[in-house]
Amino acid sequence: MNYTTVLNQVISIVNRAGNRLIAEWQRPDGPRGFYDKADVDTEIECELRPALLDLLACDFWGEETGSKLTGNQHCWVVDPNDGTADFLKGLKGSAISVGLLSQGRPVLGVVYAPVRAAGGPDCIAWAEGMKTIYRNGAQLASSLANASLTPEARVMVSSAASRKPAIN
């Protein structure tokens, strides 16, 4: 299977679902939900599930709608709003995360943050067979071994990082 071809289609599907997250963010009364559960999470996953399964019929594991695991070699893994609790607190940066596993091994991934504190949407994407990962359509360095942080660089960590410094 050519995962790079599938990747472009997944990016389109996830971008469309991102419009729902943007609309929820812009609601006059703020996003619907409480603590770490938001209505939009289930709505997005219900949009993603059939679109992804139409693209590649296989197993599915969703954070909101549950799983259907039959032993198929492929499995979609979806978190429709990674960062729901912060999203509901009014903090930008949550993301729609979609992965594809082949025999339990990641072969494709898309992380799309349509509402960010620093500018417009951000999409990180990768598929097996690609030489590097892509951010918003542009190649990123595949090795960070010789990279260094600049004063302008941003390092993203969980908002819970200060409560769990050992794992962050």
What residue spans do the PLM features occupy?
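N-terminal subdomain of lithium-sensitive/metallo-dependent phosphomonoesterases centered on the IMPase/IPPase/PAP
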Residues: 1-81
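Residues embedded in well-ordered beta-strands
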Residues: 7, 11, 59, 75, ...
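Residue-level signal for inorganic ion chemistry
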Residues: 17, 21, 52, 84, ...
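Solvent-exposed alpha-helices and their adjacent loops that cap or buttress functional pockets
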Residues: 69-70, 89, 147-150
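Short, conserved acidic/polar surface loops in the N-terminal third of protein domains
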Residues: 71-73, 87-89, 121-122
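Glycine-rich active-site/cofactor-binding loop and its immediate structural neighborhood
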Residues: 76-115
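Acidic beta-strand-loop-alpha-helix segment within the catalytic core
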Residues: 99-168
